[in-house]
């Protein structure tokens, strides 16, 4: 740090009032150091009064010179003390100026860090938007799979109805066959001796017919069992989906909550830095006001004060820009929160559809066995076994257990319930 040159104030020497020119030639002068000079006497001797007066004036001159030297020394010491105090004040001001500059640099770094964090948050928003688009596409594919699943369910229901109708037809044929068997039994009682061989053949045919009937009943029972398993799988699918949605929502909210807490903490740190900076600036401003009178006497310090004032104005503008930046970041934070809420809702919907699609794929892997071949048979011997009573079809929603009157109503309700 270069030292500021000081201009010493001129100190005027006290000049004693001298006598006439002839007296100055007679008496000698004393220098500023107080050394007496040779006294030159004229060739002619003066009166005693004149000599006495010259001695008195010489003594007065010496006293005046001594007083002038003493005042000059005091002035010099005072000037040195003043220069030392001014130098200390200058060093103090330069130290404060360096501290303010370091504070400005630190705030600039914090500003760059906040800008980087904002860019990172924008990148995360873009990534979430991309995920949302992907989930929308997955949602469309899942809807298509649900539609195909409902078509398969309707097809299996149609097959079950066809099997039920075939079973009813078989039971009708069995009843007709039973009537014929009773008639043959009456004839057998009359013609037992004559048609023993035919009776044995008819008995064999009756046994084969009973076996075919048992196979048909087993096939119908298997169809009912598969339908019940499909309904249970649907119910379990939606229960697992609800559990998965709850766990995913809790984890997503926890992660977003941590990110929001980090952003709020960063904003609070920025506010505290701005408050501390304002306090430092106010303190420096008060100190500048206190030293304003002294700085007016020193041109170099005045120029430095002008530079400091310009830096202060720049600092104020930077503080205002930081305040505007803070408001902008607050608005962006609120916008990100709204975007997060919207994306969270979309993610929940997409996760629900994705989980349902996975469950549908797992459930739809075991294919339904083909319907058993219907064996044609001829009337045979009577049978004592009767078929169990027919069970009505159960059109039940696997999610809310809604009982539908028919298959079309169930299909419409399942689509609405899933959406």
From Swiss-Prot:
Annotated segments matching region Interaction with CHUK/IKBKB:
44-111
Keyword line: Coiled coil, Cytoplasm, Disulfide bond, DNA damage, Isopeptide bond, Kinase, Metal-binding, Nucleus, Phosphoprotein, Transcription, Transcription regulation, Transferase, Ubl conjugation, Zinc, Zinc-finger
GO molecular function: any one? Answer: kinase activity
Q: Set out the biological process GO terms recorded for this chain's protein.
A: DNA damage response; positive regulation of canonical NF-kappaB signal transduction; positive regulation of NF-kappaB transcription factor activity; positive regulation of T cell receptor signaling pathway
* Annotated segments matching region Required for interaction with and ubiquitination by MARCHF2: 1-197
Region annotation Required for interaction with TNFAIP3: where it falls in the sequence: 251-419
* Location of region: Self-association: 246-365
| Chain spans, region Ubiquitin-binding (UBAN) | 242-350
Please list where the region (Leucine-zipper) is annotated: 322-343
In this chain, the site described as (Microbial infection) Cleavage is at 349-350
UniProt PTM: Phosphorylation at Ser-68 attenuates aminoterminal homodimerization.
Q: Does the keyword Oxidoreductase apply?
A: no
Glycyl lysine isopeptide (Lys-Gly) (interchain with G-Cter in SUMO) crosslink site(s) = 277, 309
Cite the binding residues for Zn(2+). Answer: 397, 400, 413, 417
Where is it localised?
Cytoplasm; Nucleus
Looking at the record, which segments are called Disordered?
A: 1-46, 363-394
Show the GO cellular component annotation of the record.
Answer: cytoplasm; IkappaB kinase complex; nucleus
**Stretches annotated zinc finger (CCHC NOA-type):** 389-419
Described function: Regulatory subunit of the IKK core complex which phosphorylates inhibitors of NF-kappa-B thus leading to the dissociation of the inhibitor/NF-kappa-B complex and ultimately the degradation of the inhibitor. Its binding to scaffolding polyubiquitin plays a key role in IKK activation by multiple signaling receptor pathways. Can recognize and bind both 'Lys-63'-linked and linear polyubiquitin upon cell stimulation, with a much highr affinity for linear polyubiquitin. Could be implicated in NF-kappa-B-mediated protection from cytokine toxicity. Essential for viral activation of IRF3.
Quaternary structure annotation from Swiss-Prot or TrEMBL: Homodimer; disulfide-linked. Component of the I-kappa-B-kinase (IKK) core complex consisting of CHUK, IKBKB and IKBKG; probably four alpha/CHUK-beta/IKBKB dimers are associated with four gamma/IKBKG subunits. The IKK core complex seems to associate with regulatory or adapter proteins to form a IKK-signalosome holo-complex. The IKK complex associates with TERF2IP/RAP1, leading to promote IKK-mediated phosphorylation of RELA/p65. Part of a complex composed of NCOA2, NCOA3, CHUK/IKKA, IKBKB, IKBKG and CREBBP. Interacts with COPS3, CYLD, NALP2, TRPC4AP and PIDD1.
Q: What is this protein called?
A: NF-kappa-B essential modulator
Q: Which gene encodes it?
A: IKBKG
